[in-house]
Swiss-Prot record:
This is L-ectoine synthase. Pathway: Amine and polyamine biosynthesis; ectoine biosynthesis; L-ectoine from L-aspartate 4-semialdehyde: step 3/3. One of its GO terms (biological process) is ectoine biosynthetic process. GO terms for molecular function: ectoine synthase activity. It comes from Aliivibrio fischeri (strain MJ11) (Vibrio fischeri). NCBIfam families: PRK13290.1. The lineage of its organism: Bacteria, Pseudomonadati, Pseudomonadota, Gammaproteobacteria, Vibrionales.
Length: 128
């Protein structure tokens, strides 16, 4: 059995941050569960370009509000209780509104190793 707390993961190398977000990677590839689980904070009043060419992701909004704009498609509001699933490697923009950051629970398949950040195209590489 594996037991971890958000606080202990946040205070370790499992916390990865960029200019627009931070991700606490609580479950990773080396945990051998077949997926990874993260608590990700999207900073308020930011926009992040993302395109997971190598991963599928499901995201549940726990707090805050914003929107997701699928490139070439629709824009969907995000608020607590919203689940969105990127099941087609959807290229998108993720925006948090000005008044509050968004806190999201995220699941990735295949699992990430823990050090990945978005490249210039919004992509996470596949790492061993």
């Amino acid at each position: 059995m594996i037991v971890r707390t958000l606080d202990e993961c946040r205070d370790s190398e499992r916390r990865v941050a960029s200019e627009t977000w931070e991700s606490v990677r609580m479950l990773l590839k080396n945990d051998n569960m077949g997926f990874s689980f993260h608590i990700t904070t999207i900073y308020q009043d930011t926009e992040t370009h993302i395109h997971y060419k190598n991963h599928l992701e499901s995201v549940y909004c726990m707090s805050g509000e914003g929107e997701i704009e699928v490139i070439g498609g629709e824009t969907y509001p995000i608020k607590p209780g919203t689940l969105y699933i990127l099941d087609k490697h959807d290229e998108h923009y993720l925006r948090a509104y000005k008044d509050k950051e968004m806190v999201m629970a995220c699941v990735f398949n295949p699992p990430i190793t823990g050090t990945e950040v978005h490249d210039e195209n919004g992509v996470y590489p596949v790492l061993d």
